[in-house]
UniProtKB/Swiss-Prot annotation:
CC per GO annotation: 9+2 motile cilium; kinocilium; radial spoke head; sperm flagellum
UniProt KW keywords: Cell projection, Cilium, Cilium biogenesis/degradation, Cytoplasm, Cytoskeleton, Flagellum
Biological role: Functions as part of axonemal radial spoke complexes that play an important part in the motility of sperm and cilia. Essential for both the radial spoke head assembly and the central pair microtubule stability in ependymal motile cilia. Required for motility of olfactory and neural cilia and for the structural integrity of ciliary axonemes in both 9+0 and 9+2 motile cilia.
The protein, known as: Radial spoke head protein 9 homolog
Amino acid sequence: MDAETLSLSLELVSGSGPGLSAEQCAALRASLPLLHRDLRLRRLRLWGVVLGLRGDYVIARGWGGPDLLRGQLSFYSLNCVDWCLLPPATDAHIAQTQGIKGRFVGDPAHEYEYIVRNTAGGGDSALEEELTTHIKEEVRLTGTIAMIDREAAVAPRGAYIRNPLGQVIVNHSFRGLEVSEGKKLSSYFHFTPSLNPKKKSLLEKAALDPSIDFLDSLEHDIPRGSWSLQLEQGDSVLILRSLLWLGMTFYHVPLTPLHGHLYIGTGERNLDLPFMI
């Protein structure tokens, strides 16, 4: 959610469970504009909160360039006032993060210990070695945010366009989805570069607009039923919740450009989802 519409956006997702306290909201309204100005960012959004045992990580996302799918900067704060820059997420960070189980502690310097199994040699003489590896919680936080973005960050169809330079930018002509369109999962896209593009037939491609239909639709997600879509607050706001990453909530006010997503959760993937649907 954008820093400029923080109060309204928090009100729209208030029915999704834990939120931010009045003190946190007041601190964010004061600190986010300063972060935006000091780093000369083009855009700044509140990404969410990763809940820890001793402290919570408040996450903000900034962009220094026009492309909203590349060059993102992630920041975290333990008090909603002082912000620290997170290292860029890499495939190695994500792989390391997937090997760690349990809640976040709330201390960026905390070190986790996990075992990596390597196979040495080949054939009948192959030996499996167990290596103990350490990873800091700050790196785990980076990898977790990247995984949530890949699997649960959402944008409505038409809200962003790809220009002739290949940059993904805000579509200023977007006026919101109709209520009838907003009730369909096909009207929402994963707001992340496509990892496994779905092959489409010529008939399907003919019905698409390449400037706005360049992302993956939620209707093809596996397993089916991993999203909950409903109208709330007197049918005035569309709410889309991820059941894979509990705490990720997307909101959109129909017939207006107002939309966004917020994550407030423990940073753990819901591995029980296949047994719940």
